[in-house]
Amino acid sequence: PSTGMPTKSEQTDLLQALYGRNGESPMPVIAATSPTNCFDAAYMAAKIALEHMTPVVLLTDAFIANGSAAWKLPNLDEYPAINPPYVTPEMEGTWTPFQRNEKTGSRYWAVPGTEGFMHRIGGLEKSNETGVISTEPENHQKMTLLRQAKVDKIADCIPELEVQGDADAELLVVGWGGTYGHLYSAVEHMRKNGQKVALAHFQYINPLPKNTADVLKKYKKIIVAEQNLGQFAGYLRMKVPGLNINQFNQVKGQ
């Protein structure tokens, strides 16, 4: 983000990534955790974008950008396939521009120029199914809910939240994005000194992993450490009410 201190690192644009659009416009948000994780994060962002027909925000930070690590070129055959919801010839004559896939809630992709699938696109609100411009109140309400549901369903396609550290810990350290290396080192240092502590680091921000609430509610105390004034902590409080969340916030550009 723009820190006012060029080349310095912060995590101060999380809420902008989540909500910085006109109206209720939910969008998936992913945060890379390290230089070596950037490729995997970008691949998954592309997979989500193409399979669910949605823009995706992929967050990095200056610390990741200026960092380096050994990275072995991956075998792409080991990555999950990307399967966009293309229209099929059998759909010609019955397809409508806003017809949705029942599993994902996404529209089918009629690539421009595909014979028999001509349609209009644009930034104005559309009527469900037909894609015709509409300002009807009930339709706008329905379309807003459909867009939110589409993003929510992405939780079915992302990995569950993993916890590292002591299985019997009462304290959970929570982070997201490029602070992973520092938080992991801090947690390991505490464990070597005899403290029972665990780490949960988030890469998928919106939607959150499906098991997020189950994981967080196991711990008596949670410390959310981030380079802002508590944006992710507030987001977690909203998504999982009732947690004992404590904040550790620094905005020092490092």
What are these regions, as identified by a protein language model?
Residues 2, 37-38, 65-68:
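Short, well-ordered, mixed-charge alpha-helical segments that flank or form enzyme active sites
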Residues 12-15, 40-43, 181, 210:
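Short, contiguous clusters of charged residues that form electrostatic/catalytic patches at enzyme active sites
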